[in-house]
């Protein structure tokens, strides 16, 4: 137990401060926007302070633990704690949410509700990454759904209600399996529920039951991550959502599924994970090729970027299913890396749409001359997406490759085959990425359009993009900055597989 309730403050602060937005003076949106940005900044600085001064990197155990008895009736606790696995996603959440809030400047309709929902999402995400209780994990998982649904259905495009309904049906359907898994694991073997992660990690199950639990959790994470074939909500959602919502979806929401896969399926159900991992490896490999090929055929700019996100999630799945130090560390690095790259690409797609009012790539062309700053930044992030050496994506994918090659679990032939197919996926990535840049920025098509409203990126947008670009290059040059956070925890998780 920590001396001071740092994590509770970090989790509760955004939603508590968000509920005070209603008390702000009715003088336009500026006050609300700056208030929200200040809350996000303060939260990010507080989180960074706590991690710098109250967290030991070389300790793989849970730190800053807090445990309050919440509901006596069935022994439900408010149980929080962080380790090397959760520290990266929490800092990523703070960083991306702060930038997404400042990106939401064009939102003027119902801006109070919009900013409150963003802060509510912030609390839910940090709560999920720091929860140490299975039921609390589920509650935080569900807390995300309502803000995202409202952000989609109220501030989306023309088909926003369709995409919002599709999102809620998919994710709520997945959550049913998550709840069944939570209750099954919590109630197994006794009348008293056992929901503490530490207790559950030492619990053994019959193999058949463990597989059922694993499969239930896997479906919930497959929807959120997404893993094919449960990915079809994602392109529609990204295609219609406002770009600040897209930044949160691509940067953080998709990473919750991958985090859950490591935190619950790998850590609490190691035998089932060992059985499922070859199948996950096959699905991840197919996903890289399928999503990259499908992305190439998309006319809608945001849908093309959405499919590229699905393709990149394939690398994370492969890293997790390799069951090696390098593979799992690479997957965690890819979670952080793609959080930055995905958020930046959706922000650029949204700001471009604000100016040219065109969604489809075949209607665009020649923007490079009219908007050189947007062209430069888009090219930079496209290069980051296709894993250019010196940027974070390259290191993450390289470490995942190393993880597969060194994995003792798989035969040499299967490792060569998987590596070969992944390499084809890495060749397809620059094809759809560079063809997207070519269709948008080169040619002469838009010179015929009256271009009085073609204004290049302003200082605010350039600032947001540079804030995202710097960590991408920083991680690419010195990946140990992120890897050092998780390396001890990864060893602790994998000890279940080699000594358990």
Curated annotation (Swiss-Prot):
This is NAD(P)H-quinone oxidoreductase chain 4, chloroplastic. The gene is ndhD. It comes from the Eukaryota. Pfam families: Proton_antipo_M. One of its GO terms (cellular component) is chloroplast thylakoid membrane. Belongs to the complex I subunit 4 family. GO terms for molecular function: NADH dehydrogenase (ubiquinone) activity; ubiquinone binding. It is found in: Plastid, Chloroplast thylakoid membrane. The chain crosses the membrane at residues 4-24, 37-57, 80-100, 113-130, 134-154, 167-187, 208-228, 242-262, 272-292, 305-325, 330-350, 386-406, 416-436, 462-482. Its EC number is 7.1.1.-. One of its GO terms (biological process) is electron transport coupled proton transport. Keywords: Chloroplast, Membrane, NAD, NADP, Plastid, Plastoquinone, Quinone, Thylakoid, Translocase, Transmembrane, Transmembrane helix.
């Amino acid at each position: 137990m920590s001396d001071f309730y740092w994590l509770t403050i970090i989790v509760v602060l955004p939603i508590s401060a968000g509920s005070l937005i209603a008390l702000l003076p009715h003088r336009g949106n500026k006050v609300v926007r700056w208030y929200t940005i200040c809350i996000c900044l303060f939260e990010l600085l507080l989180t960074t302070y706590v991690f710098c001064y109250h967290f030991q990197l070389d300790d793989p155990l849970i730190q800053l633990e807090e445990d309050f008895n919440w509901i006596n009736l069935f022994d439900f606790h408010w149980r929080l704690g962080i380790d090397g696995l959760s520290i990266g996603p929490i800092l990523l959440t703070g960083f991306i949410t702060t930038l997404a809030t400042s990106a939401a400047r064009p939102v003027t309709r119902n801006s109070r509700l919009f900013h409150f929902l963003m802060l509510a999402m912030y609390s839910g995400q940090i709560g999920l990454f720091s929860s140490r209780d299975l039921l609390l994990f589920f509650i935080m998982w569900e807390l995300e759904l309502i803000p995202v649904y409202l952000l989609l259905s109220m501030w989306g495009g023309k088909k926003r209600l369709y995409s919002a309904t599709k999102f809620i049906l998919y994710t709520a359907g997945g959550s049913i399996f998550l709840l069944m898994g939570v209750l099954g694991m919590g109630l197994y073997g006794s009348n008293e529920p056992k929901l503490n992660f530490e207790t559950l990690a030492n619990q053994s199950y019959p193999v058949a039951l463990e597989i059922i639990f694993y499969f239930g959790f896997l479906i919930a994470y497959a929807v959120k991550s997404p893993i094919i074939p449960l990915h079809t909500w994602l392109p529609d959602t990204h295609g219609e959502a406002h770009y600040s919502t897209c930044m949160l979806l691509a940067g953080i929401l998709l990473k919750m599924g991958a985090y859950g896969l490591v935190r619950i399926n790998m850590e609490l159900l190691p035998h089932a994970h060992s059985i499922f991992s070859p199948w996950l490896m096959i699905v991840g490999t197919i996903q890289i090729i399928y999503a990259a090929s499908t992305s190439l055929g998309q006319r809608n700019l945001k849908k093309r970027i959405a499919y590229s996100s699905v393709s990149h999630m394939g690398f994370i799945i492969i890293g997790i299913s390799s069951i090696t130090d390098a593979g799992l560390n690479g997957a965690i690095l890819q979670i952080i890396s793609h959080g930055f790259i995905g958020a930046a690409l959706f922000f650029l797609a949204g700001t471009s749409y604000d100016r040219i009012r065109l969604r489809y790539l075949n209607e665009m062309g020649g923007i490079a001359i009219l908007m050189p700053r947007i062209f430069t930044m888009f090219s930079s992030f496209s290069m980051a997406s296709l894993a250019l050496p010196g940027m974070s994506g390259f290191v993450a994918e390289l470490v995942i490759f190393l993880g597969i090659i060194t994995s003792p679990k798989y035969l040499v032939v299967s490792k060569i085959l998987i590596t070969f197919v992944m390499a084809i996926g890495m060749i397809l990535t620059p094809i759809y990425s560079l063809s997207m840049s070519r269709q948008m920025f080169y040619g002469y098509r838009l010179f015929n359009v009256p271009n009085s409203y073609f204004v290049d990126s302003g200082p605010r947008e350039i600032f947001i993009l540079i804030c995202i670009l710097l960590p991408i290059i920083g991680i690419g040059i010195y990946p140990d900055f992120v890897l050092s956070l998780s390396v001890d925890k990864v060893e602790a998780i994998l000890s279940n597989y080699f000594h358990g």
